[in-house]
């Protein structure tokens, strides 16, 4: 990170890391990469900077997660002042630094195919719509976000026609690979 940006984080009340790459390193930090990329929180920690980081992962992050997190922070700051308001926002983060209002629910437990999973009925192909796609590589059981409810711009979400690849998780992409398997 350039020195100017690093200095800005010293005086910032908090930093929002938007997208999985900014939050955890994402694809640039994947195995085999020579970039030495890392998430914002890891980079600040390495530099000894204690500014709180709020991670808004996703590839891409859902726009409501970004706007909602900013609105939540502004509301808490207005109600309680800067320090107490930000402390409350930080208390609403999960262990990975994500806001629980958006990342507190498991994708698998809210999947429209959960009943098929429970019945043991799995799809053999991506075009087969009558079964759970877990056997095809769906990462929903280990993924947390509310995309099942919010969708992208209220229109659609990954599992509607494909599988969850776990893009909101710190282990993405290496820990979520291979994306497709049988």
What residue spans do the PLM features occupy?
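Iron-sulfur-associated redox domains of electron-transfer enzymes in respiratory
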Residues: 1-137, 141, 148, 154, ...
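Long, low-complexity C-terminal extensions of enzymes
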Residues: 138-182
């Amino acid at each position: 990170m350039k020195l100017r940006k690093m200095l800005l984080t010293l005086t910032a009340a908090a930093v929002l890391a938007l997208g999985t790459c900014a939050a955890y390193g994402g694809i640039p930090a994947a195995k085999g990469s020579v970039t030495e990329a890392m998430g914002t929180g890891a980079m600040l920690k390495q530099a000894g900077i204690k500014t709180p980081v709020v991670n808004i992962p996703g590839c891409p992050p859902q726009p409501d997660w970004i706007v909602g997190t900013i609105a939540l922070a502004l509301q808490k700051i207005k109600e309680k002042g800067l320090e107490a308001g930000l402390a409350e926002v930080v208390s609403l983060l999960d262990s990975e630094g994500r806001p629980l209002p958006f990342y507190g629910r498991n994708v698998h437990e809210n999947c429209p195919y959960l009943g098929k999973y429970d019945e043991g009925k799995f799809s053999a192909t991506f075009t087969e719509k009558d079964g759970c796609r877990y056997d095809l590589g769906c990462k929903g059981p280990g993924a947390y976000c509310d995309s099942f409810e919010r969708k992208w711009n209220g229109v659609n979400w990954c599992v509607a026609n494909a599988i969850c690849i776990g893009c909101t998780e710190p282990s993405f992409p290496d820990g979520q690979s291979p994306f497709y398997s049988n």
